[in-house]
Amino acid sequence: MAQQFDYPKTETQLREIQDALYQHSKEVYEAGGRPAFKGLLEIMSAESTIITAIHNIKGNHGSETPGVDSKTMRKDYLQKPFPWVVADIQRAFKYFEPQQIRRVYIDKPGKSEKRPLGIPAIRDRIVQECMRIVLEPILEAQFFAHSYGFRPMRDAAMALERVDIIMHNTGNYWIVEGDISKCFDRIDHSILIKRLYHMGIKDRRVLQIIKAMLKAGVMEECAVNEEGTPQGGLISPLLANVYLDIMDEWVSKQWENKRTRHQYVQDQSRYVMRKKTTLVPGYLVRYADDFIIATDTRAHAEDWKARLQSFLQEKMKLTLSQEKTLITDIRKKYIKFLGYEFKMVRGKSRRGYIPRTI
């Protein structure tokens, strides 16, 4: 039965609802099921949610970057009467028609090429933030434990620490360095919407708004966007993680999260028992679309690469870059991950190797 909550009357009540959404989602997921939520649009369009969204956006210097309508947060919302602002956003939810996205190009760190960034209109940004506030706790409770990009209380340092732990504890030194070709530009809208529904977003009005957001075209380029999530939208990182969670779930169920007949309290006990099976070891660490899979032999690494390529094509309509997806023995060569170079070198440890990061 779908869960439904009253709309929040204060920002304190909104935080309580966020906690309740997370807790219920987590409990159902950990019990082996998936949650179901309806009535989410009422929470998203509540006055307290709109206030919170505006506070979140105005603290970002990007709030003064105009979209195609040339409007900014300070001039067109913060200086307007409060009842007008709330009514305008609630009207946007009721009759949602996103404006086209203004595209700008920014430099990629350490590279000569530029990255496209989509700038939604300020009203659409507020709507997106209202939606993110409500959707994030539901989805966060179900995401893979070792994806670290664009998530609360997580960062690249934690991803690197996880790699260190895997190397130290398992001795899985063969690495598949994953690179998905134009990942964010090729996200399939239909698969994404189905995944959101699968993860508990049963309010079809919310799904229709997300679908409209995804299809908002880019000014001077196209009227309708048929695939991808616009980089620059406030909800885009969350939606990208929802999509890539399909891959996370598939990889982790092959080894790390594969259910065993007996439930082991300690991960090490589970690891020892799995080593006695014919399963192929595979430890995934992901940060946005950058990821590695650690395994124990070259043959297993090549097996992971081939099976992952097939899975991405068949289930997600994505493609591994054959040139950039590498197989590396990190006892002999550095891997590049999240701007760092990582290698195992001879040293005093139980396995005879210690990590070195540059």
State what each model feature region is.
Residues V68, I133, G178-I180, T297, ...:
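Residues immediately flanking
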Residues D76, P120, A294-D296:
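Short hydrophobic/aromatic beta-strand micro-patches
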Residues S349-I358:
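Basic, alpha-helical interaction scaffolds
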